[in-house]
């Protein structure tokens, strides 16, 4: 999982009436996890981020999507992309920002790639929250330990200081067609 493109979009844009971060997420392949793995991931996330269960976004309740009937059948990548976006919003919220909505959509003709829209007050914090979200979910999927408290402390410091965060720096604001 990685971000392959990012842009800061100005106040009035196609996706939001407020500034937002447009990121293209590449999951690596179209169906990264089975239904059982996604259920385990949601359970583990609920333990480390209890506010995530109450979180809603423009797309509905976290993970609110039809899953395959067979327990080991692959899920569509959209479910994982939505979860990454929802975790990023929750992490962003934990810095004191009131961001509560976002958008996730598939990139046409590019299986495994998703457009994530994260409204923000501070673009650097949105970028760092998304980077932390991907790292957390990647670690949980690999069953590796992850120091979320250290990540949150760094995220809060970025929010307090306005210093550049981890991850690639998005391009300057520019109109995006499509």
Question: Language-model segments: what does each one mean?
Answer:
Residues 1-178:
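Preference for protein termini
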